Design a protein with these regions (language model features):
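Membrane-embedded alpha-helical bundles that constitute the cytochrome b-like, heme-associated redox core
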Residues: 1-191
Length: 191
């Protein structure tokens, strides 16, 4: 069990949130890689390869969305005991940290929804698979103009998420190495 600080808050995040954090991090980086890879495949690529990338990209995207919702529910339930932002951070660092975390959470919810909307609105869609559940229903009307809008939102939001993830990781490394650890070293709270 994680130890409590003097004010009754946890020193480390609960193990469930730590696992969700790292699983989502791996999945998000994998999805960004697979998105780049699958959209860059040459025209003469075998259909099985296209299907492998697109089906897995879709179902792991849905999984990231579900994990983000679970993460938010757990955070909400534990909001009064989760570790606080370290006092040693400068005001701009606290603000940046809060903004980056909230944007990462927002984008891990929106990007899969944009991806789902792409598949749902695309006139030649082969569905939205989700592991053992089967195909998710496509709720939007088929409209290739809407598909183009959702595709742009999905792509540019993914680039923004990648930039935020890099900034998030850079902040953790900065506090660990440049600040020489101490009170502002937030990495141990997630390990």
């Amino acid at each position: 069990m994680a130890s409590l600080a003097a004010e009754g808050r946890l020193v480390k995040y609960p193990v469930g949130l730590r696992i969700l954090h790292w699983v989502r991090a791996v999945l998000i980086l994998g999805l960004i890689w697979s998105g780049w890879t699958m959209t860059g495949l040459p025209e003469d690529t075998p259909m099985e390869t296209f299907d492998f990338f697109y089906h897995n990209h879709k179902q792991f995207g849905v999984l990231v969305w579900l994990l983000a919702i679970v993460h938010l529910v757990i955070r909400w339930r534990l909001r009064t005991v989760l570790p606080q932002t370290p006092e040693g951070l400068r005001p701009w660092e606290k603000t940046l940290s809060h903004v980056v975390h909230r944007l990462i959470m927002l984008l891990t919810i929106l990007i899969p929804l944009f991806g789902y909307s792409m598949s749902s609105s695309f006139t030649q869609s082969d569905g939205v698979p989700f592991f053992f559940v089967g195909e998710l229903p496509e709720l939007l009307p088929k409209n290739d103009d809407a598909f183009e809008v959702f595709a742009a939102l999905h792509e540019y939001s993914a680039y923004a998420l990648l930039a935020l993830v890099i900034l998030h990781a850079a902040g953790a490394v900065k506090h660990r190495l440049a600040d020489k650890g101490g009170e502002t070293d937030v990495l141990p709270r997630m390990l």
